[in-house]
A protein has these predicted regions:
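Catalytic histidine-centered segment of alpha/beta-hydrolase-like enzymes
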Residues: 262-271, 275
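A conserved catalytic-core segment of Leloir-type glycosyltransferases
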Residues: 2, 26, 261
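Short hydrophobic "strand-cap" motifs at the C-terminus of beta-strands
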Residues: 33-34, 231, 259-262
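Short phosphate-engaging motifs
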Residues: 29, 39, 158, 190, ...
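Flexible "cap/lid" subdomain of the alpha/beta-hydrolase fold that forms the substrate-access gate
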Residues: 2-11, 19, 42, 57, ...
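Conserved HGGG/HGGXW glycine-rich cap/lid loop of the alpha/beta-hydrolase fold
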Residues: 23-66
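A short loop-to-beta-strand scaffold at the N-terminal edge of the catalytic core in hydrolase folds
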Residues: 15-23
Length: 287
């Protein structure tokens, strides 16, 4: 996997647990936030394509990737935002361009709402940072007590389904790439973060993270004046065009690339197109 992910590992300690991140290149900061069930591996091609001109920082959320996977941990959106806040503080990051995917949207925009002065540009990949009732049946099943634990932790169903379905250009999901995505989630204990993310989706007002997401949603409009780019996989069975239209309503001036032949893992499907799009976007919107 070193050939696919040729980066130096860094870690900071958070409450005695290891919080892993990569920090490649120099220049303006690009902070790349993954979702579930991926890890910083998802951004490897973007990092390789952009680190010559930019500083690319990509953490693994606690319970994911190369970060520790404690079994008794507060795996909530608020905690993930706290962890990101600690990393940004440790690295003294400012003038940040946020690149977010999946759960990375809620985590990243949650951080942005807390520290709007630190955020200068936004790049969105098939994500949400607002409340929605739209959730596929298979995701609902994974939230059923008992069943979700057996399916996600026992059989690794969530991560296996993702490598099978989230990338539409099947030639991209080689044995090596597939192994890279699955490597951190190789046993029951190491799948704790994957399950907790699914359980933390706020589907009702009494959900733990409901008020957190509601607050983020209510504060998104303050970023309307920022440059925003959206690259959206049109064949995503979770974050479909309903979510894209919601983002366009919030950020009507956003530069949108709807990638017709890409799925949920839009960066995996279309990184050769996305890298020059990001480069052009950054150059046209200087700090």
């Amino acid at each position: 996997m070193k050939d696919l992910y040729p980066f130096t590992s860094h870690a900071m300690e958070l409450d005695s647990y290891k919080y892993h991140f990569i920090d490649e290149g120099q220049g303006e900061t690009l902070l790349m936030l993954h979702g579930n069930p991926t890890w910083s591996f998802y951004y490897r091609n973007l990092v390789l394509g952009l680190k010559q001109s930019y500083r690319c920082v990509a953490p693994d959320h606690m319970g994911m990737g190369k970060s520790d996977k404690p079994q008794n941990y507060n795996y909530t959106l608020s905690q993930h935002i706290d962890n990101l806040e600690a990393l940004v503080d440790k690295l003294s990051l400012s003038d940040i361009t946020l690149l977010v995917h999946d759960w990375g949207g809620a985590i990243g925009m949650g951080f942005a709402v807390r520290h709007p002065q630190k955020i200068k540009r936004l790049v969105l990949f098939n994500t949400a940072a607002f409340l929605s009732k739209k959730i596929p049946v298979r995701l609902k099943l994974c939230r059923v007590p008992g069943f979700g634990d057996i399916a996600i932790r026992g059989f690794n169903a969530f991560a296996l389904a993702a490598v099978g379905m989230a990338c539409k250009n099947k030639e991209r999901m080689t044995d090596e790439v597939r192994a890279g995505y699955l490597a951190p989630y190789n046993n029951y204990a190491n799948r704790i973060g994957t399950l907790r993310f699914v359980q933390d989706i706020p589907m009702s007002s009494d959900a733990l993270s409901y008020s957190v997401v509601k607050n983020i949603e209510e504060n998104l409009e303050q970023f309307k004046s920022l440059p925003v780019m959206i690259a959206w996989g049109a064949k995503d069975f979770v974050f479909n065009d309903h979510f894209l239209k919601k983002w366009q309503g919030i950020f009507p001036e956003a530069k949108v690339h709807r990638v017709q032949d890409a799925g949920h893992y839009v960066v995996e499907d279309a990184y050769e197109r996305i890298i020059p799009w990001v480069q052009e976007f950054l150059q046209k919107n200087p700090l």
